[in-house]
Amino acid sequence: MADKVGECGLSPCYSGKLLGTDHLDLYLLHWRDGITDLSGVVTAFESLHAAGKIRAWGVSNFNVSDMEDLFRIPHGDRCATNQVLYNVASRGIEHDLLPWCEQRGMPVMAYTPLGGASLLRDPALARIGAAHGCSAAAVALAWAIRSGNVIAIPESGSAAHVKENAVALSLTLTPQDLQALDAVHPPPHH
């Protein structure tokens, strides 16, 4: 189970009670907004980890500058992931954040990897899906996780969608597939 630290502060015990568990697998600081003392956050996360309340901790929506600040702090490099918006139509992190995380061996967690209903109606995704015998959603997810350093967390409303999405794990997009998607949804320019 995962949960995010919001405006109410670090409270995995409260979150655990709400979720019906005594520990969280991953606890995220959701936005840095106004937090100048990241060392206090890291110390709190490390204390929660040592107490067995959380198995890992990470951040959400941190840019490269925020990540550099975090990694300058003792134990800041124990951050398990950075959860950010990433999908075939929202590729801004490819410019700097994705390479930064890859260089440090830290996976990126992509939220909204399916990009919403309009992206799932994208003709390029549909064509590629038809060629591979799968859904546009499976293509979008396979695209998101193609580097091996991205974890996609799609929302799913049914068991059927979960099964459909799982196809992405065994789907290998061809260079032509990737070129077709780049033509419609170009990567950011450096």
Predicted regions and their residues:
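Active-site mouth loops of central-metabolism enzymes
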Residues: 1-6, 30
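Short, acidic/polar
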Residues: 4-19, 40, 65-69, 94
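Beta/alpha (TIM)-barrel catalytic core signal, keyed to glycine-rich beta->alpha loops juxtaposed to Asp/Glu
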Residues: 32-190
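CE4/NodB-like, metal-dependent polysaccharide N-deacetylase domain
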Residues: 7-28, 47-51, 73
